[in-house]
């Protein structure tokens, strides 16, 4: 499990609700000059994004980076596919894992680390409605227990 470090620019909160995250990977992302300026300004949306392995490379799809305002002719298509940078060993492992039924790669966070944009992608399996209700119920029970403990320890 890789933990995101650095300045978090965007998060995909819906991914943790809709998917069970089994493993996470930190990947670099290939961006143009105006795209990185938009990312630094936190003008990126991960909500509908997903990644896939094609020809031994990982590609990020449906991630919207708003065009940079001062970029005029240098701006790219906001919804274009972008290449993710991972080690060959990681790509091979992901390719094998994705062949399983119901598995997908979803972007969880975009953050800046040492001046470079990084994407935290998660190997995920879709949740059913009853799984979502169960996780909400578990979270509520944990909150109640913490509230009770805090109230008890406060006396």
Swiss-Prot record:
One GO cellular component term: cytosol
CDD domains from the UniProt entry: SmpB (cd09294)
Keywords on record: Cytoplasm, RNA-binding
Single GO biological process annotation from the record: trans-translation
Region feature (Disordered): 132-155
Function of the protein: Required for rescue of stalled ribosomes mediated by trans-translation. Binds to transfer-messenger RNA (tmRNA), required for stable association of tmRNA with ribosomes. tmRNA and SmpB together mimic tRNA shape, replacing the anticodon stem-loop with SmpB. tmRNA is encoded by the ssrA gene; the 2 termini fold to resemble tRNA(Ala) and it encodes a 'tag peptide', a short internal open reading frame. During trans-translation Ala-aminoacylated tmRNA acts like a tRNA, entering the A-site of stalled ribosomes, displacing the stalled mRNA.
Protein name: SsrA-binding protein
Species of provenance: Streptococcus mutans serotype c (strain ATCC 700610 / UA159)
